[in-house]
UniProtKB/Swiss-Prot annotation:
Positions with a binding annotation for substrate: 30, 44, 56, 142
Any one GO CC term of the record: cytoplasm
Domain of life per record: Bacteria
Protein name, UniProt field: Inorganic pyrophosphatase
Binding site for Mg(2+) 2: 71
Length: 175
């Protein structure tokens, strides 16, 4: 059994499973799980000397407008191992556009059964302002030194937009 068998969640869109590809604060290497084999591949070495400000992964059985599963950032008290799966609750979404088109990054917090530390966070605006700024800065800058690549941050949207992003992507994947 591989990661491809992990369901999207227990109760979409509020209770999701996120497959972690990149731990928080890790070296500037972009990893991606190959959806067919379940193997973790090095996608590229990032040209900028930056690290992901939160764990980064995706929701299985979803298809975003960019052609990939829904991207999710998960702040946790400790970095998570690549290939691990964490039960989460979405709280918001960072809407962006890059050289390939529309690109959204859902932000989700660990489910209450894993830790009570994030229970007070109901919406992206409940996250620490510094963490939101770090996430936004990271995505505004992480492709800056890569030829032909760019990112424009369109802004933050709340929990309802994150839920809709997950539901729309789940439905898109079923087609």
């Amino acid at each position: 059994m591989g990661l491809e068998t992990v369901p999207a969640g227990k109760a979409l869109p509020d209770d999701i499973y996120v497959v972690i590809e990149i731990p928080a604060n890790s070296d500037p290497i972009k990893y991606e799980v190959d959806k067919e084999s379940g193997a973790l591949f090095v996608d590229r070495f990032m040209a900028t000397a930056m690290f992901y400000p939160a764990n980064y992964g995706y929701v299985n059985n979803t298809l975003s407008l960019d052609g990939d599963p829904v991207d999710v950032l998960v702040p946790t008290p400790y970095p998570l191992q690549p290939g691990s799966v964490i039960r989460c609750r979405p709280v918001g979404v960072l809407k962006m556009t890059d050289e390939a088109g529309s690109d959204a990054k859902v932000v989700a917090v660990p489910h209450s059964k894993l830790t009570k530390e994030y229970d007070h966070i109901k919406d992206v605006n409940d996250l620490p302002a510094l963490l939101k700024a770090q996430i936004q800065h990271f995505f505004e800058s992480y492709k800056a030194l890569e030829a032909g690549k760019w990112v424009k941050v369109d802004g933050w949207e709340g929990v309802d937009a994150a839920r809709q992003e997950i539901l729309d992507s789940f439905e898109r994947a079923k087609k």
